[in-house]
From Swiss-Prot:
The active site is at residues 69, 363, 385. It catalyses: Inactivates bleomycin B2 (a cytotoxic glycometallopeptide) by hydrolysis of a carboxyamide bond of beta-aminoalanine, but also shows general aminopeptidase activity. The specificity varies somewhat with source, but amino acid arylamides of Met, Leu and Ala are preferred. It comes from Streptococcus thermophilus. PANTHER family: BLEOMYCIN HYDROLASE. Its EC number is 3.4.22.40. Keywords: Aminopeptidase, Hydrolase, Protease, Thiol protease. It is an enzyme of class 3 (hydrolase). This is Aminopeptidase C.
Length: 445
């Protein structure tokens, strides 16, 4: 190993002081902050909020201090359809309802994984992976589908937000504390030679305690409820004693098995045209596993555009924190100019960023529009976020096409937009990725 010599460091001082530009940038950044000092005017000019395809201007939702973006994005795609179909002024489905059942199911999932890995050393990478975060707020499209199909949905008015759903830190802290304690008891019980029946009985005791904890922090979810509304024509409608699953079937009415997840992960370990799943990723035990098909970016974008041309918004996952201005709602590769200001060049490509842990899926949102040029190619994309209406343009964001290429990783589209060859590849036995693969990272946030 080579240490840093005094002579080398003195040379760096001299080189810095010889460049007047660095001094000017130093003054700007130390007074105004890094990104504000190097933000480009051009990125704002190029990325206005006018789109040739624009599906909705509905009010945005707000996940607040929680990691429920994947739920919000899915429920937002449903509510746009519901607002249109039933002629409503506005409407929101309960994210807290889905959140409750996800926490309940994830707790069971974790305990089952602990039982399945009881023969491994406590220091094994998989056991450590489980214990590092027994459960969290994040998730994947297939996981939210499992929740909707098992538990349905309810209007937000029926099961509103709580302090714990809007700010989940305390809820997660003590739920994970409880789950780690349960994990130790189960591993010790198995090590003592207890049979499967005894282990499952103990797990069920834990789940009663967990259910009680969730009900007391989030509120007991309804098994049936009454629902009434007036449409835009002032017609009154009501439902009495409807269940969450019946509400989903009647008011959402989508066959979720008709949708597939498409990823763009251009790394050597994930050839295009193949299906993939992620080990130990899920929430509902017994539900279909998370599955993706990996396709080139041009095809990936073709599918998203085709679905929006058909009038349907697109759930998608990206690395939203990369080169973005949250307040203005601009996601663009040229939003900050590190090259002209600081002589820093970003040369790492999308595959390199994935391989070297510089980028991963961090946030799910909804594509609700796109601006196409004369040849039908995308220029910029309209995004419905779930960070409230105080950021972006009343909560909507815009992404340049170059940003989409570099930092978008997943979309959910209808099966009938895939070719027969693509559908066959999706339905083939998937390659199993490691639990810590970046294509599973949206569920670890």
């Amino acid at each position: 190993m080579t240490s840093l010599s005094t002579d080398f460091t003195e040379k760096l001082f001299a080189d810095y002081e010889a460049n007047a530009k660095y001094g000017a940038i130093e003054n700007a950044v130390t007074h105004n902050g890094l990104l504000k000092s190097i933000e480009t005017r051009q990125s704002e000019v190029e990325n206005d909020f006018v789109f040739s395809i624009d599906l909705t201007k509905d009010e945005v939702s707000n996940q607040k201090a929680s990691g429920r973006c994947w739920m919000f994005a899915a429920l937002n795609t449903f509510r746009h359809k519901l607002i249109s179909d039933f002629k409503l002024e506005s409407f929101e489905l309960s994210q807290a309802h889905t959140f409750f059942w996800d926490k309940y199911e994830k707790s069971n999932w974790f305990l089952e994984q602990i039982i399945a890995t009881a023969d491994q050393e406590i220091g094994s990478r998989k056991v450590k992976f489980l214990l590092d975060t027994p459960q969290q707020d994040g998730g994947q499209w297939d996981m939210v589908v499992s929740l909707f199909e098992k538990y349905g949905v309810v209007p937000k008015s029926v099961y509103p937000e709580s302090v714990a759903s809007s700010n989940s830190r305390e809820l997660n802290q003590y739920l994970n504390k409880l789950l780690r304690q349960d994990a130790q008891i189960l591993r010790d019980l198995i090590a003592s030679g207890a049979d499967q029946a005894a282990v499952q009985a103990k797990k069920e005791e834990f789940l009663q305690e967990i259910f009680n904890y969730l009900a007391m922090t989030l509120g007991l979810p309804p098994r049936q409820f009454d629902f009434a509304y007036r449409d835009k024509d002032d017609n009154y409608r009501s439902e009495k004693g409807i269940t969450p699953r019946a509400f989903f079937e009647k008011y959402v009415g989508l066959k979720l098995s008709d949708y597939v997840s498409v990823i763009n992960a251009p790394t050597a370990d994930k050839p295009y045209g193949k299906s993939y799943t992620v080990e130990m990723l899920g929430n509902v035990v017994g539900a279909p596993s998370v599955r993706y098909i990996n396709l080139p970016m041009d095809r990936f974008k073709e599918l998203a555009i085709a679905q929006m041309k058909a009038g349907e918004s697109v759930w998608f996952g990206s690395d939203v924190g990369q080169v973005s201005d949250r307040q203005k709602g601009i996601l663009a590769t040229n939003v900050y100019d590190f090259t002209a200001s600081m002589d820093i060049n970003w040369t790492q490509d999308k595959a390199g960023r994935l391989d070297y842990s510089e980028s991963l899926m961090t946030h799910a949102m909804v594509l609700t529009g796109v601006d196409l040029d004369a040849d039908g190619k995308p220029i910029k994309w309209k995004i419905e976020n779930s960070w409230g209406d105080k950021v972006g343009q009343k909560g909507y964001f815009v992404a340049s096409d170059a940003w989409m290429d570099e930092y978008t990783y997943q979309i959910v589209v209808r099966k009938d937009f895939l070719t027969a060859e693509e559908l066959a590849a999706y339905e083939a036995d998937p390659q199993v990725l490691a639990p810590w693969d970046p294509m599973g990272s949206l569920a670890s946030k």
